[in-house]
Design a protein with these regions (language model features):
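Membrane-embedded alpha-helical hairpins and interfacial helices in multi-pass inner-membrane proteins
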Residues: 69-70, 91-175
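Hydrophobic alpha-helical transmembrane segments
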Residues: 6-11, 34-35, 46-53, 70-74, ...
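Generic transmembrane alpha-helix motif of multi-pass integral membrane proteins
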Residues: 32-48, 82-86
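Hydrophobic transmembrane alpha-helices
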Residues: 1-38
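Small-residue faces within membrane-embedded alpha-helices
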Residues: 9-13, 17, 48, 52, ...
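Interfacial aromatic-anchored transmembrane helix boundaries in multi-pass membrane proteins
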Residues: 17-31, 53-87
Length: 175
C-alpha cells in the first residue's frame, strides 16, 4: 500500500486498540471487531485484513501476548477480509445499517468465536476429540453472544460516521 493508505490503516489500528482498552473493565464487550468490520467496508478487504491482524497483535501488548495471539490475529483479519469482500463495493449507509449490524453479530459469534473456541481446544488439550470441541463451543457461546451484541451496538453507533469519514479520506488522498 501507498504511504497515504498506511497512515489511514495505522490510525484505524490505533482506534481499534484504544477502543478495546477503554472497555477493558467490561468482559467480552469490546468495539474492536466493529472497527475492523468498518475498516474492511470502508477501505476494502486488504485493509480490513491488515487492520484486523494488526489490531489484535498491538492490543495484546496491553492485554498480554500468548499462544492465542496468532489465533486472534487470524480471526480478526478474516472478519476484516470478509467484510471488505462482501460490503466494500455496494455499501449504502441508509440501506445497509441493519444488515451490517446483523453481519457483525454473526461474525462475532460464528467466525471470531468459532475460530477462538477451536483455538482453545487445540492450544490446551493433548487429546483432541469431538467432545472437547462441543464443550468449547457450548461454553463459549454466551461469551460470543455478548461479543456479538457489543458488535451490533458499536456498529449501529459508529458505522455511518466512520465510513463517511473514510470515504472523504479516500477521495481527498486518492486512496
Amino acid at each position: 500500500p501507498q504511504a497515504r493508505k498506511l497512515v489511514v490503516i495505522a490510525a484505524l489500528v490505533t482506534i481499534a486498540v484504544i477502543s478495546r482498552t477503554v472497555f477493558y473493565m467490561i468482559p467480552f464487550f469490546k468495539p474492536m471487531l466493529a472497527v475492523v468490520i468498518i475498516s474492511g467496508i470502508g477501505l476494502g478487504w486488504e485493509c480490513g485484513f491488515i487492520v484486523g491482524t494488526a489490531s489484535a497483535f498491538m492490543s495484546n501488548f496491553i492485554f498480554g501476548q500468548g499462544p492465542w495471539t496468532p489465533w486472534q490475529m487470524f480471526a480478526m483479519g478474516t472478519v476484516g477480509l470478509i467484510s471488505g469482500l462482501i460490503f466494500s463495493k455496494k455499501y449504502n449507509a441508509d440501506k445497509m445499517k441493519i444488515p451490517v449490524c446483523i453481519y457483525g453479530f454473526l461474525c462475532a459469534v460464528v467466525i471470531y468465536g468459532g475460530i477462538m473456541d477451536t483455538a482453545s481446544v487445540l492450544m490446551y488439550s493433548n487429546d483432541v476429540n469431538t467432545g472437547l470441541f462441543t464443550a468449547a463451543y457450548i461454553s463459549g457461546f454466551p461469551v460470543n453472544v455478548i461479543h456479538g451484541i457489543s458488535t451490533i451496538i458499536f456498529l449501529a453507533l459508529m458505522q455511518k460516521g466512520m465510513i463517511k469519514k473514510l470515504n472523504r479520506v479516500k477521495i481527498k488522498y486518492s486512496i
